[in-house]
Design a protein with these regions (language model features):
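P-loop NTPase catalytic phosphate-binding loop
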Residues: 7-133, 138-211
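Conserved P-loop NTPase
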Residues: 1, 208-215
Length: 215
């Protein structure tokens, strides 16, 4: 018997969507794409070791690269996990990959992202809009969506964010100006509620215990 393959909902041409899999609903005899809107919210991916967190980040990177141009989307990658993501350093969309031993490079990336947020706030104010989507819908194409992917948030926080918290302002202000964060981690504990409150999108892979993903 044929199973219906549901058509995707109509999407705004200003938004960045990526397909990460298929949802199977046997009781409805229905299959549909599982897609993430990377323009409207930050995403937190939680899962135990070997649960597929890095694979999911790679799926997102490839999905963006296959469906959007570098003029539409720029990627920045912070890999404090398996270091596999540095294989994407030469991707045309990728502005840089930072690993755990790249102290100066990481600081420069934080400065660049902070400067970009301030620049974009000024650009939006110039035409009287308060969101990046409104800026794009006004016909502006000079600014790409920026997506920052972080593998192993706990390690990043422990190694570099104890004295100066570079990330919290970026998490808080990014979405409104076209900067999205996709963060992968073993568990929510140790990240802190002030970080988690900026992630409306939450994806839970296999976890050994419910405490790993409880908020």
């Amino acid at each position: 018997e044929t199973i219906a393959y549901e058509q995707s909902e109509k999407k705004s041409g200003s938004e960045i969507w990526v397909n990460i899999g298929i949802v199977d609903e046997p009781e409805r005899q229905l299959q549909k794409k599982l897609e993430l809107n990377l323009s409207t919210q930050n995403y937190m991916i939680i899962g135990s070791a070997q649960s597929g967190k890095t694979n999911l980040l790679q799926t997102i990177i490839r999905g963006v690269a296959e469906n959007y141009t570098p003029q539409e989307v720029n990627l920045y990658i912070i890999d404090f996990g398996s270091m596999i993501l540095r294989n994407y350093a030469n991707l045309n969309h990728c502005g840089g990959v930072v690993c755990s031993d790249d102290d100066e490079k990481l600081k420069n990336l934080f400065k660049l992202l902070n400067k970009e947020i301030n620049l974009r706030k000024e650009k939006l104010a110039e035409i009287g809009v308060s969101s990046f989507l409104a800026y794009k819908e006004a016909g502006k194409t000079d600014l790409p969506q920026i997506i920052v992917l972080i593998d192993n948030m706990t390690a990043l926080k422990e190694m570099y964010l104890q004295d100066i918290d570079y990330l919290l302002p970026l998490f808080r202000d990014g979405i409104a100006v076209g900067m999205t964060f996709v963060v992968a981690n073993l568990q929510t504990s140790g990240i802190g509620q002030r970080y988690l409150s900026n992630f409306e999108g939450r994806i839970t892979l296999f976890c050994n215990d419910s405490s790993e993903y409880s908020m």
